[in-house]
């Protein structure tokens, strides 16, 4: 279990027991379950992406309320691509380097990146997919403010390509200490997506 992560929150709809069982098994296999807590996802039938965005917003508010130094947020379709020893090693490399960070993505689909002086880390300029990411407590307010702005507009317009949580955050990425581990430690599982209301084949 990584001592570098204060808390792990996994987001799961009440009606997706299948996903709950899968993510909880992932966490148990990785010896992370004792540090994890389930967040009851906000259910917006027919507007899954709206519920998703509000869920991420509420998780960040919850992390702030609990004064966690950081939080690893996982969606319930997250699956690890590495074993627990590799994951622990990659986290240890990152945290022992004492790199000032706002967000560190462990799962991602990157459109634009820059190299860093660290072989285990890349600087994110533009990336999406919010299935697995670590947020530092000093950055909670910044993302909370952004999501509080975007979520109502998303609900009204359904312009998800602009206002969904993993799209709107692209406004912050270039100028923030926003990183991704060079080793992609996880991805979204393929399966039925409540956000898209259809089967999704996921490769990232």
Regions found by a protein language model. Name each.
Residues 1-74, 78-204:
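An acidic/histidine-cluster motif and surrounding catalytic segment
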């Amino acid at each position: 279990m990584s001592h570098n992560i204060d808390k792990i929150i996994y987001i799961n709809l009440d009606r997706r027991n299948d996903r709950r069982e899968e993510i909880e098994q992932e966490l148990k296999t990785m010896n992370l379950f004792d540090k994890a807590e389930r967040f009851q996802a906000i259910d917006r039938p027919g507007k899954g992406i709206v519920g998703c965005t509000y869920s991420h917003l509420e998780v960040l508010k919850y992390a702030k309320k609990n004064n966690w130094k950081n939080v690893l947020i996982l969606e319930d379709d997250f699956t690890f691509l590495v074993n627990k020893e590799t994951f622990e090693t990659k986290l240890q490399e990152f945290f022992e380097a004492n790199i000032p960070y706002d967000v560190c993505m462990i799962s991602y689909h990157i459109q634009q990146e820059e190299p860093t002086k660290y072989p285990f880390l890349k600087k994110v300029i533009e990336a999406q997919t919010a299935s697995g990411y670590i947020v530092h407590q000093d950055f909670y307010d910044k993302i909370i403010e952004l999501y509080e702005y975007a979520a109502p507009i998303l609900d009204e317009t359904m312009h998800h390509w602009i206002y969904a949580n993993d799209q709107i955050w692209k406004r912050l990425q270039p100028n923030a200490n926003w990183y991704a581990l060079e080793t992609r430690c996880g991805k979204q599982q393929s399966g039925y997506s409540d956000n898209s209301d259809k089967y999704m084949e996921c490769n990232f």
